């Protein structure tokens, strides 16, 4: 959990989230439970003991601990993705400035990066979702659909998806892998927006 906390603090230092924004979840290989950041806790002050354990089944999810806290309001998003995979897996939802600016300018993120093949070597960018409400089941389902789960490989075809006027969801087999997808896409978004070609 220390690495997850470090990522949240780094995101806050980059102004990618305000104190109570952003959420991260993860599950261990073969587990029927996952852990998620709580709602309303300042991310720069979060501790290991604040994480909430969630059980999963095909009918939904159930909170198992820390009943004085609520799981992130985006729990449906995390449940939809983590309930699909059996491997160790991480889901990161943040609000990076330049990526959101690019989408607000009308760009579909895969179009933004197609002139930058170095990014595509490591990060596969899905089509943006529609303009969907935060915390909604619709947001959760669109993110999972656009990330494109592949049954045979039991993995997703894409690594990151943008939510217009909101943020991104990035996934990976480690917290660093998921976070690096955001770092790469944010870097390219900054380059494109700085070029004044939009």
Give a label for each model feature.
Residues 1-198:
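Glycine-rich flexible loops
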């Amino acid at each position: 959990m220390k690495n997850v906390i470090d990522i949240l603090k780094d995101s806050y230092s980059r102004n990618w989230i305000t104190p109570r924004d952003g959420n991260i979840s993860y599950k261990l290989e073969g587990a029927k439970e996952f852990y998620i950041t709580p709602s309303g806790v300042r991310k720069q002050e979060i501790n290991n003991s604040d994480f909430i354990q969630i059980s999963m089944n095909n009918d939904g999810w159930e909170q198992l601990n820390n009943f004085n806290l609520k799981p992130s309001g985006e729990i449906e998003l995390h449940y939809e993705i983590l309930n699909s995979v059996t491997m160790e897996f991480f889901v990161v939802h943040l609000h990076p400035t330049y990526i959101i600016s690019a989408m607000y300018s009308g760009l579909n993120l895969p179009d933004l990066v197609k002139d930058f093949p170095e990014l595509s070597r490591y990060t596969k960018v899905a089509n943006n979702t529609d303009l969907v409400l935060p915390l909604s089941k619709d947001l959760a389902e669109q993110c999972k659909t656009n990330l494109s789960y592949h049954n045979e490989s039991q993995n997703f075809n894409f690594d990151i998806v943008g939510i217009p006027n909101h943020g991104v969801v990035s996934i990976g087999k480690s917290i660093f892998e998921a976070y690096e997808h955001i770092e790469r896409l944010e870097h390219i978004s900054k380059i494109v927006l700085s070029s004044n070609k939009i």
